[in-house]
A protein has these predicted regions:
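C-terminal motif of bacterial Sec signal peptides marking the signal peptidase cleavage site
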Residues: 18-21
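Beta-alpha junction/loop-to-helix N-cap segments that form part of ligand/metal-binding clefts
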Residues: 97-156, 250-265, 269
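Flexible loop/turn connectors
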Residues: 276-327
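Flexible loop/hinge segments that line or gate small-molecule binding clefts
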Residues: 129, 134-175, 273-285
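Hydrophobic alpha-helical segments within soluble ligand-binding/sensing domains
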Residues: 50-51, 148-190, 289-310
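Extracytoplasmic "Venus flytrap"
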Residues: 51, 55-82, 93-102, 198-202, ...
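An alpha-beta-alpha
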Residues: 57, 75, 166-213, 315-330
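Bacterial signal peptide processing site
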Residues: 23-26
Length: 330
């Protein structure tokens, strides 16, 4: 009962912080990116697709976990709202790389061999593979859940595409997250972050955390891993050094999040997530994005390309700006 009471107080404080400070302090868009037009989702009628036309798309996903699964669900929902429905005028080929870079490349080669009309790449590593494989083929690539398209070399500094590729970014609302952690843990001094050294999306987020942490009275203690096999020992070591942990959208780490949560729970170390699915499986709270909405936004972009209204190479990448608070009351 005491734990639930303390948790309720912490959640109320965090919710108040969100209402007072974060509603107007959205996550920053990556430099040069176009902001999301949230009105479009609710007001735009389904797009017109010629009855005789049918399309085949390939969806390549880097890892199997909640946020990326939600992106895929949202992407297909976004396409359907625009008139492209799986099983009617849309054939969907789906493959998952299970966090393996070599498999990511094979997936893209397979899609191209099957002459897909468009590739959707979910997460940074497989988006890079898609760009490399498709750049001289004329097949457009639409990515989603790419934290920093510029650092990933998928966009120029001004947000314009580097080729026939565009999509959406899941740039983390880092300052909102730090403000939430400070509100919920007023005495905490150190935050641990585990990340994959091979994922540029995580390296970008780590740097942003390190730059902003001191403003909120925190020190960031980082731990890089090269594979899932490194995570158990890395977690044991990191948990000895920190007051809490916060999780990125790092695919390698998120795939092992239940293990990390188990180890942290045994030591009484709170773990914060970066989106709702991480909270659902045990993280204390998160200031994060809605990945279904991110996927829907990406689906709308893909629909424009399939209809021939725009080319991917003409579209700057887009960012959802609004961060939302998710809390675990269990």
């Amino acid at each position: 009962m005491m734990r639930k009471h303390v948790m309720a107080v912490m959640m109320a404080a965090a919710a108040a912080m969100v209402m007072a400070g974060c509603s107007g302090n959205n996550s920053e868009a990556s430099k040069g990116a176009e902001t999301a037009k949230t009105e479009a989702a609710g007001t735009q009628e389904a797009g017109t697709v010629p009855e005789a036309e049918s399309y085949t798309i390939g969806i390549g996903q880097f890892a199997e976990h909640g946020s990326l699964d939600n992106c895929r669900t949202g992407f297909l929902q976004g396409l359907e709202k625009e008139g492209f429905k799986e099983g009617e005028n849309l054939t969907v080929l789906y493959e998952n790389a299970q966090t393996d870079g070599g498999t990511s490349s094979q997936i893209m080669d397979n899609f191209l061999a099957k002459k897909v009309d468009l590739i959707c790449a979910i997460a940074t590593p497989i988006a890079q593979s898609a760009y490399s494989a498709a750049k001289d083929t004329g097949v457009p690539v639409i990515y989603t859940a790419v934290t920093d398209p510029v650092l990933a070399e998928l966009a120029a500094e001004d947000g314009t595409p580097v080729g026939n590729i565009t999509g959406t970014s899941d740039k983390l609302p880092v300052e909102n997250q730090l403000e939430m952690i400070r509100t919920m843990l007023p005495d905490a001094k150190t935050i641990g972050i585990m990340y994959s050294t091979s994922e540029v999306n995580s390296i970008s987020a780590i740097e942003e955390y390190k730059e902003a942490a001191s403003e909120y009275g925190f020190e960031i203690v980082e731990s890089g891993v090269s594979s899932p096999a490194d995570i158990p020992l890395a977690a044991d070591s990191l948990l000895e050094k920190v007051d809490c942990m916060t999780n990125l959208t790092d695919n390698t780490v998120v795939s092992s999040l239940p293990l990390i949560l188990d180890k942290a729970g045994k030591k009484g170390i709170p773990v914060f997530g970066s989106e709702v699915e991480q909270v659902k499986i045990g993280c204390l709270a998160a200031m994060g994005l809605d990945y279904i909405s991110l996927g829907e936004q990406t689906g709308r972009m893909a629909a424009q390309v399939l209809r021939g209204e725009k080319k991917a190479e003409e579209m700057k990448f887009e960012v959802i700006e609004q961060a939302a608070f998710y809390g675990n009351s269990a």
